[in-house]
Amino acid sequence: MSRVGLKPVEIPEGVELKLDNNTVTVKGPKGELSRELHPDMKINIEDNVLTVERPSDHKEHRALHGTTRSLINNMVIGVSKGFEKSLEIIGVGYRAQKQGDKTVINAGYSHPVELEAIDGIEIEVPKNTQITVKGIDKELVGAIAANIRAIRPPEPYKGKGIRYTDEYVRRKEGKTAK
């Protein structure tokens, strides 16, 4: 049994948390996030420490308990520190560049792939083979990074494609001649 829901969430200096019925709004130095939570979960705030309580030990409530706590914790971390995902592009002629507010990726297709700017997400290209996705919403940062990776996922024979910086790509051996 997971005990994630029992851990308290520390609210750091400069982060303001507001509860309105089932909606939690977290405001911090990096921005503001709000999310509607399940009505069965009870949230208590005392001395800059937030705890989540469940009404019973039903399977559904146990699952929601940890999920609710993690969602709130991710919001608090997001508005105070932010989230970041790094990707690297491997392959001859594969590269990325910024053109105004667009990010253009050449990944071996007959056309370059253009990514529009999204509110609350910052896409940086420190080198033409690296992309960094930054933002305060963990879900959105992960989704955008996954969409970029999906443009050209790494292939197992030569390892060409777009991958996360810390991702390990399992390599396969090619066919051997008779």
UniProtKB/Swiss-Prot annotation:
GO annotation terms (biological process): cytoplasmic translation
One cellular component (GO) term of this entry: cytosolic large ribosomal subunit
Listed Pfam families: Ribosomal_L6 (PF00347)
Keywords in alphabetical order: Ribonucleoprotein, Ribosomal protein, RNA-binding, rRNA-binding
PANTHER family: 60S/50S RIBOSOMAL PROTEIN L6/L9, LARGE RIBOSOMAL SUBUNIT PROTEIN UL6M
NCBIfam families reported for this sequence: L6_bact
Main function: This protein binds to the 23S rRNA, and is important in its secondary structure. It is located near the subunit interface in the base of the L7/L12 stalk, and near the tRNA binding site of the peptidyltransferase center.
Subunit structure: Part of the 50S ribosomal subunit.
Family: Belongs to the universal ribosomal protein uL6 family.
This protein's name: Large ribosomal subunit protein uL6
Gene source species: Oceanobacillus iheyensis (strain DSM 14371 / CIP 107618 / JCM 11309 / KCTC 3954 / HTE831)
